């Protein structure tokens, strides 16, 4: 029974991560078409590729920094409003999805900890390592 639950949760994680990647790809594809430049040609491209981890002001600052490479002027009202609307629309989809992914991940962790009979101290050690691993991946 636990195996079936873990298999179901793993399948849900895969589906939610697929949805997340589709939204990110869709937004970045729209952005390329709107600004007339490839994300790879802008700096810092990693901040644009992980736009969902930043607020709109940070996103807009990166776009403005690359103004000379763009077909639109992000300082003008109309392009800025369009950028903000699209950014917020994407974040509106990604925010709840990322939260569901986090909660599902936490549930899987809790089930595994229980399955292996880990103590609070052991869980703390595992979570500390997990946290460090996530920090390393985000560099």
Go through each PLM region and give its residues.
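S-adenosyl-L-methionine
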Residues: 1-139
């Amino acid at each position: 029974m636990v195996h079936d639950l873990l298999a179901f949760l793993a399948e849900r994680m895969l589906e939610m991560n697929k949805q997340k990647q589709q939204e990110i790809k869709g937004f970045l594809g729209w952005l390329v078409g709107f600004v007339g430049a490839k994300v790879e040609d802008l700096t810092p491209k990693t901040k644009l590729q992980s736009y969902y981890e930043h607020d709109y002001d940070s996103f807009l600052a990166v776009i403005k920094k690359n103004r000379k490479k763009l077909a639109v002027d992000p300082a003008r009202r109309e392009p800025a409003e369009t950028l903000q609307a699209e950014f917020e629309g994407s974040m509106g989809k990604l925010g709840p999805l990322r939260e569901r992914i986090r909660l599902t991940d936490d549930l899987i962790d809790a089930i595994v900890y229980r399955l292996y009979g880990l103590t609070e101290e052991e869980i703390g050690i595992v979570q500390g390592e997990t946290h460090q691993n996530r920090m390393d991946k985000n560099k």
